[in-house]
Regions:
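Phosphate/NTP-binding elements of NTP-utilizing enzymes
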Residues: 1-174
């Protein structure tokens, strides 16, 4: 950003989202741009990976650059924490952050087999309304969280059709 490093100070709606992430296993978020929700999701994923052992967190984004940006946000948040809070060793590359406690955060672009062989603690799907073949991808991903894993599916709107829209409508009806 033009102002350099910015301290993460949350807004009430962001706090509400984090509370929903904790209270509900499956979450869908309809958002506008530049609300900081991807940053909040990165911070939430980091919290889960740091404070709980053996968490497998997968982030799926529309393209590789967006996935890379997510791991950069995780790394930035991690490096901004007090030294006493950071696990002694972590590995970072453009695709993944791994921790000594067995937890990892992986961010990848969408593909039809994304995450299919994984058992996930947390699945984050960013800009889901813009993912081609999201219905097929979601069907495959759903089984990765079937043993108690959590999901956060977020997107800006992209018309009144497609799997993201269908999931949103189902959530609104509940």
């Amino acid at each position: 950003p033009i102002r350099g490093k910015i301290k993460l100070e949350t807004y009430n709606f962001q706090d509400d989202c984090v509370k929903a992430f904790e209270d509900h296993r499956l979450n869908i978020v309809l958002k506008s741009r530049q609300l900081g929700l991807s940053t909040i999701c990165a911070a939430y994923a980091l919290w889960m990976a740091l404070f709980f052992k053996n968490k497998n967190i997968l982030v799926i984004a529309t393209k590789f650059a967006t996935a890379q940006n997510f791991t950069k946000k995780v790394k930035y948040a991690l490096e901004s924490l007090p030294k006493w809070l950071i696990l002694p060793n972590f590995e970072y590359n453009q695709k993944e952050v791994r921790f000594d406690n067995g937890s990892k955060i992986t961010a990848i672009p969408t593909s039809e087999d994304a995450g299919r062989s994984e058992a996930l603690s947390l699945l984050i799907v960013d800009e889901a309304a813009f993912i081609k073949n999201f219905e097929e991808i979601w069907t495959g991903l759903n089984s990765t969280i079937s043993r108690g894993g959590r999901a956060i599916v977020l997107s800006t709107p992209n018309g009144a059709e497609g799997q993201y829209y269908h999931l949103w409508q189902q959530a609104e009806a509940k």
